Amino acid sequence: MIEWGHEPTTRNAEEAALLPPLLEMLASRRWINESTIIHNEFAWNGRRVDVALLGKRNRTAAFELKLGSFGRALEQAMYNRLSFDRSWIVIDGMPKPVSLDYASVNGVGVIVVTDRPRVVLRAGLQTISPVVAKRLSAQLKVARQ
């Protein structure tokens, strides 16, 4: 399992229950490893990203954890998409087909955590401004220390 160096938390205690299964799934798929920089409640552009990752190839990913409120999660994930290489929603139940269509059209991935997490829709790889990507990568590295 990935070592955090501190106990990860979220602002919402109920949403925090989505975090351990998400991290376990990411590790089991080898999407994260010991060199991955992982932040929760990462401050970025005047908002907080629930979980932000920086991989060894400087690829970034943002995850919005939500219970039920798919519309709000999609809105936040779309903001994240402007700065992160991949943007995901992690939710506790299967969204309606129309909601999945909205996510798909906008390049946002969906992970459903019920008995075990599963990827319902893969996030598209975004083309990020090199200036934004460099700034985000630097901030993720600095915030780690």
Protein language model regions, located:
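Short amphipathic alpha-helical segments and helix-helix/interface helices
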Residues: L23, A77, S99-L100
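Basic, amphipathic alpha-helical patches used to engage nucleic acids or provide basic targeting signals
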Residues: R72-L82
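Nucleic-acid nuclease catalytic cores
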Residues: K66-F70, S83-R116
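Short secondary-structure boundary/capping elements
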Residues: A43-G46, G68-R72
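Acidic-basic catalytic patches of nuclease active cores, encompassing PD-(D/E)XK
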Residues: M1-W44, L54
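Non-catalytic C-terminal interaction segments of nucleic acid-processing enzymes
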Residues: M1-H6, E24-A27, N106-Q145
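Conserved catalytic cores of phosphodiester-cleaving nucleases, focusing on short active-site segments
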Residues: L22, V51-L53, R57-S69
